[in-house]
A protein has these predicted regions:
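Gly/Ala-rich beta-loop-alpha elbow adjacent to hydrolase catalytic centers
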Residues: 82-87, 91
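Active-site nucleophile elbow and catalytic-triad environment of alpha/beta-hydrolase enzymes
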Residues: 162-184
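Flexible "cap/lid" loop of the alpha/beta hydrolase fold
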Residues: 96, 100-102, 106-143, 174-175, ...
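Active-site loop/oxyanion-hole signature of alpha/beta-hydrolase fold enzymes
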Residues: 39, 45-79, 96-97, 120-124
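Conserved HGGG/HGGXW glycine-rich cap/lid loop of the alpha/beta-hydrolase fold
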Residues: 8-52, 72
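Residue in the alpha/beta-hydrolase core beta-strand immediately N-terminal to the catalytic nucleophile
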Residues: 44, 80, 103-106
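Conserved loop-alpha-helix segment in the C-terminal half of the alpha/beta-hydrolase fold
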Residues: 196-223
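Short beta-strand/loop motif that positions the catalytic acidic residue
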Residues: 192-194
């Protein structure tokens, strides 16, 4: 346990994994936060734990409800909600729908939710191509192959092996369903953490530029 003299303020972090991943991907981060004296929990979203054989049942709203249900079940308020990649779309909706429970939202190289648009709509990917892949893969969005992972410069051989053995396809509706964002993102206290080229290919550049003008948003760069 961390020396309480070194903890300025105990926070409760809830960590949401990106597409193809479960709570396991946050294990080291969660342990580091706990050593610093914080509470930290990671959630595996519906359809990503291997227990559901009907991907059509799981929608984007299901993942939003997964997080809301966790916060309510544990009576959690003033939480720091952290999302990565796909789950930025999830945590942004949770913060907009339950601002009384979310003190701060952190987007770690994450996509942002846009009301009425899906992850695929804002991602910069070929939407029709991705939809075909989902249809051909039993309704699941296929994870990147080992070859595709090996093309990522920040992944070493051990991490590539770990990811290739554990990534699973999320239900396709989670990336094709439109987001519901009842409050403007610029009104919600948030931090956006990313490398300089993150989202350079996406359709969210104008949104990011507008959010940089919000006093409630902080931007941090990964070198």
């Amino acid at each position: 346990m961390a020396d309480p003299r070194h903890v300025l303020h105990e926070m409760h972090y809830v960590l949401i994994p990106g597409a193809w991943m479960g709570a396991w991907v946050w294990a080291e981060v969660a342990e580091t936060l706990r050593r610093e004296g914080h509470q930290a929990h990671a959630i595996t979203l519906s359809g990503l734990d291997g227990s559901d054989d009907d991907p059509a049942r799981v929608r984007l709203a299901t993942h939003v409800q997964d997080v809301l249900s966790y916060l309510r079940a544990h009576a959690v308020e003033d939480v720091v909600l952290v999302g990565h990649s796909y789950s930025g779309v999830v945590v942004g909706q949770v913060a907009a729908q339950a601002p009384e429970r979310v003190a701060h939202t952190v987007y770690v190289e994450a996509f942002l939710p846009v009301d009425g648009r899906s992850l695929l709509d804002v991602s910069g990917l070929d939407v029709e191509h991705e939809r075909r892949l989902i249809a051909e893969n039993g309704g699941l969005w296929p994870p990147p192959s080992r070859e595709e992972l090996s093309q990522q410069p920040f992944l070493d051989a051990d991490l590539i092996q770990r990811l290739a053995s554990r990534l699973v396809g999320p239900p396709g509706h989670t990336v094709t369903d439109a987001a519901s964002v009842p409050r403007p993102l610029e009104s919600l206290p948030s931090t956006f953490i990313a490398g300089k080229d993150w989202l350079s290919f996406s359709r969210e550049q104008d949104l990011l530029k507008s959010l940089r003008r919000s006093p409630r948003w902080t931007f941090r760069s990964i070198e």
